[in-house]
């Protein structure tokens, strides 16, 4: 496993990380989570991602209990969680000072931890002044409940505004953004965020490297495997949107490239994401140890992605966004 700094911070995170979205509390219980997490550690993963909203908090409970029972040293791992959707009440969601503080304390209780390493604002909140959110995230850091803070699915403008507020108030700005990034979702990472890397040293922990499994090739025959996330009731609409013929045709076109390198489609897709120098860590998911073992081999695929190979991939997927002319 390779380790990178998370943005311009001194925090080292594994190139590949593990996220609890969908799986913990929906498809996996504590016993299964323990084997999955230990398999990740055995492959050098030190970074594990969660959120207060995942399985309505159950994902944090499962991860916390699993880590406790595994007996891991807290200093050996990097844990992140995300705040925004905490419950049904009017103050149980969003990025007000009240919800950030109360939501963080509730997450730590579920995780059974004194702190998380990174706390994300899970979405932007137009109803709360950015100064209030920045102050609240700094309060959480000052209390020792989190060491760093970041954003998830924010726009470049919103992140720039957060940094502007932090600079004005002489406070800590966000060091990391968590966007979707894969061969079919590239605009933010490759164009919109370009000024953020230069101006603020923002790092990225990207999610959905396999486009919800589409880039594994398992949906290419049209049928949805019963153990896949698209088989879950909540993800039926996602399945209909993602499994369009054009995308599946492109995935099929990637197969010869993967075969030539002697790797799987999943390994190729994950390595492709990790090869972007602005990506600090690629968040992966899995329901079985065998999936983790396959995914982790993507680290060895990164050096194989020469400019020639990347060009071959681009000719198939044809999804490269145009860079804005105004940015140098």
Swiss-Prot record:
It comes from the Eukaryota. Its EC number is 1.1.1.-. SUPFAM superfamilies: NAD(P)-linked oxidoreductase. Transmembrane segments: none annotated. Probable accessory potassium channel protein which modulates the activity of the pore-forming alpha subunit. This is Probable voltage-gated potassium channel subunit beta. One of its GO terms (cellular component) is monoatomic ion channel complex. Belongs to the shaker potassium channel beta subunit family. Keywords: Ion channel, Ion transport, NADP, Oxidoreductase, Potassium, Potassium transport, Transport, Voltage-gated channel. InterPro entries: K_chnl_volt-dep_bsu_KCNAB-rel, NADP_OxRdtase_dom, NADP_OxRdtase_dom_sf. Gene3D superfamilies: NADP-dependent oxidoreductase domain (3.20.20.100). The gene is KAB1. One of its GO terms (molecular function) is oxidoreductase activity. It comes from Arabidopsis thaliana (Mouse-ear cress). NADP(+) binds at residues 21, 27, 49, 152, 178, 207-211, 218, 229, 285, 287, 291, 294-295. The active site is at 54 (proton donor/acceptor). Expressed in roots, leaves and flowers (at protein level). CDD domains: AKR_AKR6C1_2.
């Amino acid at each position: 496993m390779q380790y990178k700094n998370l943005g311009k911070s001194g925090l080292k995170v594994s190139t590949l990380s593990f996220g609890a979205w969908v799986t913990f509390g929906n498809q996996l219980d504590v016993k299964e989570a323990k084997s999955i997490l230990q398999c990740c550690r055995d492959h050098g993963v030190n970074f594990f991602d969660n959120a207060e909203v995942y399985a309505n908090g159950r994902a944090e409970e499962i991860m916390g209990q699993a880590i406790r029972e595994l007996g891991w040293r807290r200093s050996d791992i990097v844990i992140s969680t995300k705040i925004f959707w905490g419950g049904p009440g009017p103050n149980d969601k969003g990025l007000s000072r009240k919800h950030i503080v109360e939501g963080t304390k509730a997450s730590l209780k579920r995780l059974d931890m004194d702190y998380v390493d990174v706390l994300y604002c899970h979405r932007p909140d137009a109803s709360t002044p950015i100064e209030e959110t920045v102050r609240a995230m700094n309060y959480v850091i000052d209390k020792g409940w989190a060491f760093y803070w970041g954003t998830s699915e924010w726009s470049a403008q919103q992140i720039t505004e957060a940094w502007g507020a932090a600079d004005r108030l002489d406070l800590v700005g966000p060091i990391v953004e968590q966007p979707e990034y894969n061969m079919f979702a590239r605009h933010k990472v490759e164009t919109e965020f370009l000024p953020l890397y230069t101006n603020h040293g923002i790092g990225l922990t990207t999610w959905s490297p396999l486009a919800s499994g589409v880039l594994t090739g398992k949906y290419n025959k049209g049928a949805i495997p019963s153990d896949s996330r698209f088989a879950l009731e909540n993800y039926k609409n996602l399945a209909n949107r993602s499994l369009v013929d054009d995308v599946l045709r492109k995935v099929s076109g990637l197969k010869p490239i993967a075969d030539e390198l002697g790797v799987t489609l999943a390994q190729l897709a994950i390595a492709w994401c990790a090869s972007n120098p602005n990506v600090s860590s690629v968040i992966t998911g899995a329901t079985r140890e065998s999936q983790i073992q396959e995914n982790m081999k993507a680290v060895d695929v990164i050096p194989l992605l020469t400019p020639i190979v990347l060009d071959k991939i681009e000719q198939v997927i044809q999804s490269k966004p145009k860079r804005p002319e105004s940015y140098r």
